[in-house]
Amino acid sequence: MATEEIHSLYDTILILDFGSQYSHLITRRCRELNVYCEMLPCTQKISELSWKPKGIILSGSPYSVYAPDAPHVDPDVFTLGVPILGICYGLQEIARVHGGTVDAHTHREYGYAKIEVVKTGKKDQDALFEGIEMEADGGLQVWMSHGDQLTSLPPNFVTIASTPTSPFTSVAHESKPIYGVQFHPEVSHSPRGKEVIAAFVKNVCGVRDGWSMESFIPKEIARIRQICGEKGQVIGAVSGGVDSTVAAKLMHEAIGDRFHAIMVDNGVLRKDEAKKVHKMLTVDLGVNLTVIDASELFLARLKGVEDPERKRKIIGNTFIEVFEAEAAKLEAAAEKELAEKGGEAKGKIEWLLQGTLYPDVIESISFKGPSATIKTHHNVGGLLEDMKLKLIEPLRELFKDEVRALGRLLNIPEHLVGRHPFPGPGLAIRILGEVTREQIAILQHADDIYIEEIRAAGLYDQISQAFVALLPVKAVGVAGDARTYDQVVAVRAVSTEDFMTADWFVFPPQVLKRISSRITNEVKGVNRVVYDITSKPPGTVEWL
């Protein structure tokens, strides 16, 4: 959904990100409250926004607010006339702007803390904790993660919560809807934190809680129909993953047979993927699907390339080229139909569907100060600048769990909705080194065994994503009486709510043992299996 359109349909909370590892959780908590919100870098100029938020939340940050390179908010934030909530660093930024003092404290607070809410007796000042049930001792358990803290109140601010070591844990302006909390209400370790956020967005900001997948479907279908008109045609990039499948189903619901689902076999798909996807989309969903075998073209362009960013760019650019060529064929067919049927004919092919999600957008933002781009996502930063087709991305504002919920509402079978994600660049970013047919075959076989064993153990639906990575190293092994010198694969499985953070999955030892045994015995060229136990952060889900 386009930015201007979505803000005309939903009240929006703006989250300004200062580089905190928890920033995305603020977004998640708002969405869980059926409140639409959007995260932008802290460097965002308010004057450049084409819409006005109902409220603004300033995130935490790894920086000290007085450090020479510390990020700072646009001063216009405080003249916009909307409620503001500062979290951790956000509180300190509010204090800095309004004349308070922030210092490094001798007692750093990391972990659980108990705050005492201070009632001022004034409704607006007490609004942040209004109606929240305190614990038996009268306090409220929260999660702290800060070294600096507010040591003197800015003029016209009052204390609304404190701890023994932090007298200004939460503050409020005397007459304006500006609040700050030193703790992190967005994390699960603050049990009542979601209620604090709810008090701000609903009670203080007055946001209408209309954001839900039930409301999203008719509005997005109406938007798609308006964009495409009565005759416009769309080609859809589908891979068989949940994102593109849900996007394709939504598009098919909106414009019917004017939507053309196209799958590009780029040579770096999972084993027998093209056949499986064709069956799933045509039999289960009734979508008209064309499969284009462009594997020779992709592999020729990937020859000799090891750098993951170059792989992404090559695959993204080649992907668009193939789609444009197919669009030209469809356009020629449309022109022929127009000549034969006149006004009964369909319109031009103008749009390219992609299943871009909100985490893709977040991770592809390059902040000028506190953060750096993690990687260029295939769906966001790897497209041709001179692309002739226009992108249509109906899922761009959604998190993965929202997409799955949307799929279920669209009556997509559970075995499709629950499928693990697969990256746009495919196995090319799971092969750490040059992509060759031999390496692809090894990885396809190992990955197929891995997923088969996970399903057999009844663990597939407990895992958010699982895959095998082929490493660019060899190890000595023994097969019978012979010495081997073959490749190493890493198996990875993670659990996550939204793919912004993830924990490695704890397998029963016997399952890992069987996975390792089967791969080393059945996959020629592999003699060692390792298990990746890295969480996100510090790692990413994919290796490249």
UniProtKB/Swiss-Prot annotation:
Activity control mechanisms = The enzyme is inhibited by ECC1385; although this compound fails to inhibit growth of the organism.
E.C. number:
6.3.5.2
Cofactors: Mg(2+)
Q: Which organism is it from?
A: Cryptococcus neoformans var. grubii serotype A (strain H99 / ATCC 208821 / CBS 10515 / FGSC 9487)
Q: What is this protein called?
A: GMP synthase [glutamine-hydrolyzing]
Task: Report which reactions are catalysed by this protein.
Answer: XMP + L-glutamine + ATP + H2O = GMP + L-glutamate + AMP + diphosphate + 2 H(+)
Q: Which GO terms describe its cellular component?
A: cytosol
- Indicate which residues the UniProt annotation says bind ATP: S239, G240, G241, V242, D243, S244, T245
